[in-house]
Amino acid sequence: MALPRLRVNASNEERLVHPNHMVYRKMEMLVNQMLDAEAGVPIKTVKSFLSKVPSVFTGQDLIGWIMKNLEMTDLSDALHLAHLIASHGYLFQIDDHVLTVKNDGTFYRFQTPYFWPSNCWDPENTDYAVYLCKRTMQNKAHLELEDFEAENLAKLQKMFSRKWEFVFMQAEAQYKVDKKRDRQERQILDSQERAFWDVHRPVPGCVNTTEVDFRKLSRSGRPKYSSGGHAALAASTSGIGCTQYSQSVAAAHASLPSTSNGSATSPRKNDQEPSTSSGGESPSTSSAAAGTATTSAPSTSTPPVTTITATINAGSFRNNYYTRPGLRRCTQVQDTLKLEIVQLNSRLSKNVLRTSKVVENYLAYYEQRRVFDPLLTPPGSQADPFQSQPNPWINDTVDFWQHDKITGDIQTRRLKLWEDSFEELLADSLGRETLQKFLDKEYSGENLRFWWEVQKLRKCSSRMVPVMVTEIYNEFIDTNAATSPVNVDCKVMEVTEDNLKNPNRWSFDEAADHIYCLMKNDSYQRFLRSEIYKDLVLQSRKKVSLNCSFSIFAS
């Protein structure tokens, strides 16, 4: 059988992982629970009039176990789960090629862990041809080829016409080995091999669960290797030699049906790997080796089963889920999901506004600022509520710019901007002067002076930074000798002193932000209610009304 391709220099940590390994891992955990000798599915040997059927269980027992242990109340859910497990080849019906489960007395058998899909089996057509050719040599009714198998055999014989003699010789050699096995052992291994091919070469009309979407295969990062890098290289890189490796797998496979429950009674502790050979070994070849190991006593060259098991656990079985390259991809997926969870939680913690509310806020902001936009409301037009001078860019007069200097009054538009925003007040030089006069009367003028000096510090030249830092500290921050100390709390003062250990243009940012918040929340509101601001508004309104009367009289 063609085994999974490995890198030429592959190590134990670089083995391939099937793109569906997470699904297989969950199924195998469930199957291992079913294989438990005490709490698992009851496996028994059924006696008939002339023969025995070893290591089987009924569909009723399986469905009952699923509903009991998985706490399912719906029979259809239990049947669906059983169908999924059977379709992936973890259990099979002993006398039918269709991998389904019925809730009746039909007998089923668990697949040996050696044939589990998590081992990344990729069987070739030559292996399938050997298997079908071997089936034709066995004169038994239950081993006769089905119609679709006979058609497949004819196609394969035509495909491999040049090397069909080699295929026939392999099938004949495997058939001779099978004849030396015990009857019950041969019966179990034949059914397991048939179930393996029912999964990888299913009956026409059934779903092939081993097919992987090429896009999914590419996303999983699984490389595509040439036929030169065979799985035998893995044995050379591991701690077990090639011969000992194949013997250990064969012995482990042969020990499975020797128990009372057959091959299904040994839970899968780790991911087994297929046996290796230079030309590719089929499942029947490994079964033949298993039969030889079972029927004959171990020789001096073959280590005991316990030693083999320990060696496998220390070597080949070390490549479990946690040490394979799939861990990197799984870790990336987990990190992505964790990041998404953090982002979603942050969204839940934020104040969420409805779209209609956001639109209302935008419309309100537009209506508030529209009168100040000269493109939407041209100055001097009928829509201008402030009756300002005409726009100097489209008229032959510059009165709009010279109005305050000529008349000595402040325009209503300018005062309205101060009222709408504290930022607009500070951005206007005349607004800062007016606010400074008010703060001086309130005995808190040092706050605005300190904030403005910090703004100048941020934009000054580099050679002036140490000088300005010293001046600002001596005038506003020094607790012992400051001429105009500002009111900052202890935490801000500690941060500022730490920043002054390495003076730069951002040393006073925390203190400036603190003072800015104080002025915006307290001083600005008192300024709008002060007599200074009210007098300015009253004078501007009188000027506007006088201009309107003159314009009406002139018209």
Swiss-Prot record:
Residues 253-307 are annotated as: Disordered. GO terms for biological process: feeding behavior; G protein-coupled dopamine receptor signaling pathway; G protein-coupled receptor signaling pathway; intracellular signal transduction; negative regulation of signal transduction; positive regulation of locomotion; regulation of egg-laying behavior; regulation of G protein-coupled receptor signaling pathway. The keyword Isomerase does not apply. It is found in: Cell projection, Dendrite. Residues 37-112 form the DEP domain. PROSITE patterns: DEP, G_PROTEIN_GAMMA, RGS. Residues 256-267 have a biased composition (Polar residues). Residues 421-537 form the RGS domain. Coiled coil: none annotated. It comes from the Eukaryota. Residues 274-307 have a biased composition (Low complexity). Pfam families: DEP (PF00610), G-gamma (PF00631), RGS (PF00615), RGS_DHEX (PF18148). One of its GO terms (cellular component) is neuron projection. Residues 330-395 form the G protein gamma domain. SMART domains: DEP, G_gamma, GGL, RGS. Involved in egg-laying and locomotion. May regulate G protein goa-1 signaling. Plays a role in regulating dopamine-mediated locomotion behavior. This is Regulator of G-protein signaling egl-10. It comes from Caenorhabditis elegans.
